[in-house]
Amino acid sequence: DFVPFTNFLMRTVGFFQNPKYDLVQTPQFFYNPDYHARNLGLSNKMPNDMEHFFGHVQPSRDNGNCVICCGTSYVVRRSSLEAIGGYYTGCCVEDYQTSIKLLTNGGCIAYVNELLSMGESTRMFADFLDQRLRWLQGNMQVYYRKDLHIWTKLNWIQKSFHVSLIFFCFNPVVRAISLVMPLLSMFFGTAPLITSVPEYLFYAAPFAIAFTFVFGWSTGDRLSAVWNEVYETAFCFPALNRLFLVLRNPFAKASTATRKGVKADRKNYNFNQTYPLLIIMSLTVIGIVFHYGGYMLGFWAINQHEYAGKEILMVWLIYNFIVMAVAVLSSIDQPVRRDVDRFPLCTFCKLTIDDRVYWGYTNDLSEGGTSLTLNKNNELSNLKHDQEGLLEFVEQGLAIRCTVLRAASSDRFGNASIKFRDVTLEQNRKLIVLLYCSLEWWKERKKPNGLDSFLEIVAAIFKCKPLLNVHKN
């Protein structure tokens, strides 16, 4: 499910001139938008959730020779792989464990932080969860295998990365506590912090500001702290269930290979995965209405000692509610009507129909068709529905038979939707190279800053696109 760029081997194979290198890993990048961003209508604004790992974590691990093999977008020395008995199959994932075997065998893994391939990410929330839960279980299984000698054959820097990974695997526990704690405090009348707002801001504000900016700076603005919390919140409770399973039976079979290319044909709310968040959100609304509404309406007297710190509790509850609301909205799968993905490739082209020539350029392009902007000097009135012709991509030397689906004309330009037909194997190969095998502008990593990410998250709640969008069959 990954397509290498034409310069992939040129940028990676040279490392193997040095005999110490056993594997060269490159980042994974995806041509279809992350399901969170797509469902929220933010496809062109927000990065994939793996940006933090490939843009920040992997380069950090590279400094200590502890890079993780990620299953795709890498090159491995065959003799090194054979020396450890081939790919490791003792866990539910093989890539991470194989890289550990290489490292414990005295090997060295390099990381080239350069986009050299494109792949397909999961398109549905359930598939995303299944993939991430399988990764979580595979990461935990490493510490139960006796033939992976992490603590005896790795140096202390490499061991430190594995210790940090253990803490990362238990991050859903911390996330669950942060979601439930303010709710329990409100219902049981025990404020987690007995302090005034100025006192709290004096200590907490510098940390919050530093964390937000340092997180963005250290990741090259590839991922914001707030957007990262949406991912963690959506993943939290399913991950807790998997963690409990792993602690009871580490090698229980709970996941299969990730489905790719599967698209939703109707709106799917995924209540089975998000109902814990919906329950917490409902209890939050009920608690705020009864607790603070009772004070405001005079139903019960204010206890001054109990009320100390309640302003902070209120802000905590509202913030959690916003993050949970975005996580729930992002989990509502929206139907996909296109059979293939389209990309905003602009290239000069020539359309020939019935001995008439139309010049223009592509607005977007896919393996199945394209949208054209045509020169108004042509006789666009002669362009009709279902006409057959030949579309030539002048710069690429590629010509494909096509059919006109729609045509329209404005004051200066004309537009036409084209569907390819009778595409040969050679033509399809050229289309794939044109679409996937080079670093075009739309494939560059998205880098929203923290403020933009927060505003997009707040706007997503008010717009409620996943709920309000109406899709006709």
Predicted features and spans:
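Acidic donor-binding loop at a coil-to-helix junction in glycosyltransferase catalytic cores
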Residues: 92-98
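Long helical/loop segments within the catalytic core of UDP-sugar-dependent glycosyltransferases
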Residues: 6-92, 104, 125-164
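Nucleotide-sugar-dependent glycosyltransferase catalytic core
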Residues: 122-137, 224-225, 254-260
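Active-site donor/metal-binding and catalytic loop motifs
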Residues: 113-127, 215
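The conserved acidic donor/metal-binding loop of glycosyltransferases
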Residues: 1-3
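Catalytic donor-sugar/metal-binding loop of nucleotide-sugar-dependent glycosyltransferases
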Residues: 101-117
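Membrane-embedded multi-pass helical conduit in multi-pass membrane proteins
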Residues: 168-253, 269-334
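Structured alpha-helical
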Residues: 269-473
